[in-house]
Design a protein with these regions (language model features):
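Active-site-adjacent structural elements in enzyme catalytic cores
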Residues: 1-178
Length: 178
């Protein structure tokens, strides 16, 4: 975990295991890292981040107090919530329309420890180039991205699907991905 934090602090890119898929991570406040990540993915645009716990995730969001319990409940099971975020939480390069960002709390010990130790939100996007299937084996990740990624955290082969994604907008919910 300390090695991953060092790589992130230096503007590097990591591939790390989550409870759903391997993720590509960088410091969400480091614009050079985000540009490098976008180049790896062959795209630009919104990128989700991970939080160490639901309280932190809600603290990053710009939502009314009376919506917090519902959001906290939706964050269960590794779901991603797209919601407006407070200023200076992440770079605008990862934000979507209306200053929204997808935030999730993975049910994976490595993610929880890493996101608790690192001082900024860490990006979490599947390990693949846009339009291709996510890579689930550390060896495949290494072979495909050997010159692009600074550190691969080798856990196990992960054969899951991506998280469910919910959009919280204008006090209502829309499911974006099942």
């Amino acid at each position: 975990i300390s090695e991953a934090c060092n790589v992130l602090n230096k503007g590097g890119i990591i591939a790390y295991p989550t409870d759903t898929l391997y993720g590509l991570g960088c410091d969400s406040k480091n614009e050079q890292s985000i540009k490098k990540l976008n180049k790896i993915k062959n795209r630009s645009g919104p990128i989700s981040v991970i939080a160490p716990n639901r309280r932190t995730a809600i603290d990053w969001m710009f939502v009314k107090k009376n919506h917090e319990a519902t959001i906290k409940n939706k964050l269960k099971n590794g779901n991603t919530i797209i919601a407006p975020i407070k200023n200076n939480i992440c770079s605008n390069l990862i934000a979507g329309n209306k200053n929204t960002v997808g935030i999730r709390v993975p049910d994976h010990l490595f993610c929880k420890k890493l996101s608790k130790l690192f001082p900024h939100p860490i990006t979490s996007t599947s390990v693949n180039r846009t339009g291709e299937k996510p890579l689930t084996k550390p060896d495949d990740i290494s072979n495909e991205f050997i010159s692009d990624i600074d550190l691969i955290i080798d856990d196990v082969i992960i054969n899951c699907v991506g998280s469910k994604i919910f959009l919280f907008e204008n006090c209502s919910w829309k499911q974006r991905r099942r």
